Amino acid sequence: MNPFTDYQVQFFERIKLKPRIIESLDDISEVLVACSKVFTFENLDIISNTQEALTRKVLIKQVLINKQGGLCYKANTLLYYFLLDFGLNVHQTRATCENQESHSRWNIGHGHMINILNFENKLYVMDVAFGCNLSLRPVPITDDGSEVIESCIGLYRVIKRENIVAGVYHYTHILEHRKPDTYLIESAKNWVIGYAFDPLLICKNDGDDDDDDNNNNNNTHQTQIQQLVIDDPNKDFCVKPLATKLINNTDNNNNNNSIATLTLNSFTLTNCKTGEKIKTNFDNDNLFEQFNQHLISIFNLPPLKIIPQIFLNQTSNFPINNLNS
């Protein structure tokens, strides 16, 4: 008898792990690492104006079947369903991210979806879609930040703070992160706020009370956050295309972890240990073709079929044979 649900088998196949029972923190960490190698943090459906209402079935279709990536509300939700099927005590909550470029303002209020794990009466944050700020292990939720998790990308901790106000939302904890000591940029080694959240706030999900998954609730938390991204006055994720993922690149027979980042007009590899960058700028008259080539070759994502307007705005010599083909 197969001990796994159809969804678990599908999820294991997508993250390229052999099916096994997930019951310990080490087991969960293996899943988080596998997710980081497969799931791309990207906003391409929003940029292409092809977004859908995000029910459980739609998320499965987009990310597991069609092998797309997505923002936090997609990857973290699929992880939630996967762990829930193993009987783990997990729920989702909504957070507010601090702007990761300036650290001078909050991003979209209540616009980040994370997972909270209650394991042996201790709470942990699990997040596989905070851009490429990935702990790759559950991060213990503590009052003083004394338990630090270190991954190849950086260090992570959770601290309790009294009455954190982010816009109109009030939270109780913050997740902080910094780069490793080997990083060449000194300022990046300072702790900064990633996001604020309340681990006891539970977000109910589509299909949670419906074993047959015939729920047609289109107003899910995931759909709500997606709409917040689209309507964001700061336009952090709704105008410029972005795809980023942790990758392993081989250099002189040594495996090095890098963050691959694809934008409208460039592709960048950032060394996780040192922060050193290798950047390739695209030819302005060939942006869309080069963008799609990198989606396929680096991120293993399907190419864009509809040309977003922002690409057309960048060049007057756009190849006719590429138009919305």
Curated annotation (Swiss-Prot):
The active site is at C72, H112, D127. It catalyses: an arylamine + acetyl-CoA = an N-acetylarylamine + CoA. One of its GO terms (molecular function) is arylamine N-acetyltransferase activity. It is an enzyme of class 2 (transferase). InterPro entries: Arylamine_N-AcTrfase, Arylamine_NAT_domain_sf, Papain-like_cys_pep_sf. Its EC number is 2.3.1.5. Signal peptide: none annotated. It holds the Pfam family Acetyltransf_2. It comes from the Eukaryota. Keywords: Acyltransferase, Transferase. Belongs to the arylamine N-acetyltransferase family. This is Probable arylamine N-acetyltransferase 1. It comes from Dictyostelium discoideum (Social amoeba).
